[in-house]
């Protein structure tokens, strides 16, 4: 469990945790963190329930609700993950550059598609529900 005295400062085992992304799904608030790449669900009051670490990620940079699921973009590998019933499913590494720190910087839903912006390549990727593991690159 994580305790928050204010919206922007939380502690977990005595160390500060920064929340870097958030999304609401089924009336519940989910947040991603830095520096441990974890996802928490708001449990009421000052309490957050830890859902776990997303792979070996360090920061949850972006989150979006798409097709009834929570999608997660990360640093340092620019990976996209999906939250499936409390379990994280790896989907794709988007930024294939040789930079040591790659990230899915932003996510948004528009026109029935999920979009993801990346750094340092500066590319925007999109996918559509019902398509099998495809990411269009712009």
Regions from the language model: what does each represent?
Residues 1-20, 24-28, 34-61, 65-69, ...:
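Trp- and S/T/G-rich repeat-edge/linker motifs of beta-rich repeat architectures
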């Amino acid at each position: 469990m994580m305790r928050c005295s204010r919206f922007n400062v939380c502690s977990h085992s005595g160390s500060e945790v920064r929340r870097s992304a958030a999304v609401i799904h089924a009336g519940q608030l989910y947040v991603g963190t830095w520096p441990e790449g974890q996802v928490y669900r708001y449990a009421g009051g000052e309490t957050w329930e830890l859902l776990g670490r997303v792979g070996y990620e360090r920061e949850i940079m972006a989150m979006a609700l798409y097709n009834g699921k929570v999608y997660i973009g990360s640093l340092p590998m620019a990976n996209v993950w999906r939250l499936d019933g409390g379990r994280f499913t790896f989907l794709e590494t988007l930024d294939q550059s040789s930079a040591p720190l790659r990230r899915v910087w932003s996510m948004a839903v528009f026109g029935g598609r999920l979009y993801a912006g990346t750094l340092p390549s500066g590319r925007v990727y999109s996918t559509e529900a019902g398509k099998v593991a495809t990411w269009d690159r712009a």
